[in-house]
Structure formats: C-alpha cells, structure tokens
C-alpha cells in the first residue's frame, strides 16, 4: 500500500485542501491520502491556532464519505513541535510494509532544506509537490519528486479566519459540515 501524507495545521480545512487531496488520490498511484493534523508547526505561530482536537473534528467531517481520504492524528502523541522526519519514522515503525510519500506545496518544497533532516526526507521519500499552473502530474528531474498540477483556489486558512473575524461569509470556502460546525461553535471569532 502507498499512502500520501498531507501535513498541515488545517486551521481550518478548506475546499482548497480537499481539491488537492482528491486530485492527488485520483491522478497518482497513491492508494490513500492521509490528512496529518499538526498540533504545532515549528515554522508557524501558535496565535489563533484552534485546539488540535477541534481541527481534527473539522477534518473528519470534511472528508466523511470519501474512502480514499483519511485523517491522521499521529502527531498528537509525539513531542511538540512536530517534525516531519520524526512522524515519518514513527509511522514506518507502526505500519511496516506501507510506503509513505509526502504531499506538500511548492513553497514548502523550496524551504525543505530548512526542515529538520530535510535532505534525508528528499532522499528517502517520494514528494508530491502541488503547483499553481499546468494540467497534469509529471515527474521532475529528481526521480522522487512529482510536480502535481492540481486545480487550486487562491484561498488559505488564514483568509478563511480573516473572513470569519470580519463577519463575512465563508459558506463556499469550506464544506457545509465544516461551515455549520464553525458557525455553531463560534470558532475563529
């Protein structure tokens, strides 16, 4: 089995995240895509970060009914901040025989050398890097890096949070279940 790990804070998960995961699942040889909720990203501020269990719940309800998309809370039990290499090591021990690949944005890929053990990640794992233009999945010069031209929306979780704080609608930026939960719970106000 081959699983793509899509790491993120998902604060909150929005339709852009779902489009990328779905596209990669349908247009690569990956059997599943796991949304790995990062409780604490070492490169991001904790300010405005919704509780990790609330974010986990939002991802769960966003992908409900999609058999190839899964949520993974493995980093909740690991030391914080979360480092991708440590999570990968733990997952390989827990799931022997599973081949893990990493899904990341072009911005993260260009900064991979700044990550803890970034060069080891590049050596050992296939990387699915999503871009903002183009039409198909193709192999880059590096035989472990696939440039994925998924349809992308120019939205971000920070934009969704800003809209909520400003009292504006986020109805079409997130799935209906996520929208309903955010409104009901009063998240990000």
Locations of the language-model features?
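Nucleotidyltransferase catalytic core that binds NTPs
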Residues: 1-189
